[in-house]
Regions:
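Residue-level "edge-of-site" marker
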Residues: 86
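Conserved beta-strand-loop surface patch within small alpha/beta domains used
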Residues: 1-80, 89-149
Length: 149
């Protein structure tokens, strides 16, 4: 299971809709739980470095950008716990390309964007043997702010 608060879900949705008709992507920053669950505290949006004509169906994240996200998480005493990206005019289901480039411990949140609006958001977790993805439950919770500043 992956826990997303409303602010995180809104941020993923906004990024996916803003970059439509191109794919967007970013890192999920948060905590791993002892039971294998994950809590996403925030996202770290990344630039799609893919050449212009391929951005509609592929996202390319450069290693230097991943390292920057990992450093950001570490500085906040958090972990990179997954990755999110959009599928313009396609279902929120992992592609073979997604399977070929995934890691077993992370959550993979995919936003389906149809005609510029997010239609569905699903999360996926890869089998340890890397053979396939299984859908992962998303639990949403209200964003709680600290009233004391």
């Amino acid at each position: 299971m992956v826990i997303l608060n409303e602010k995180v879900l809104s941020s993923i949705t906004a990024h996916a809709e803003r970059d439509y008709p191109h794919e967007c992507g970013g890192m999920l920053i948060g905590h791993f739980a002892a039971d294998g669950g994950k809590t996403v505290a925030e996202i770290y949006p990344l630039e799609n470095a893919r050449e212009e004509e391929a951005r509609h169906n592929r996202v390319l994240i450069l290693p230097k950008d991943v390292m920057r996200a990992e450093r950001y998480a570490r500085d906040k005493k958090l972990d990179v716990i997954g990755y999110y990206h959009s599928h313009p005019d396609s279902p929120a289901v992992p592609s073979q390309y997604d399977l070929d480039h995934a890691l077993p411990v992370w959550s993979y949140v995919i936003a389906s964007v149809v005609k510029g609006k997010v239609a569905d958001v699903l999360s996926w977790k890869m089998e340890n043997d890397r053979s396939r993805f299984n859908e992962e439950n998303i639990q949403t919770e209200e964003f709680a702010t600290n009233a004391h500043g």
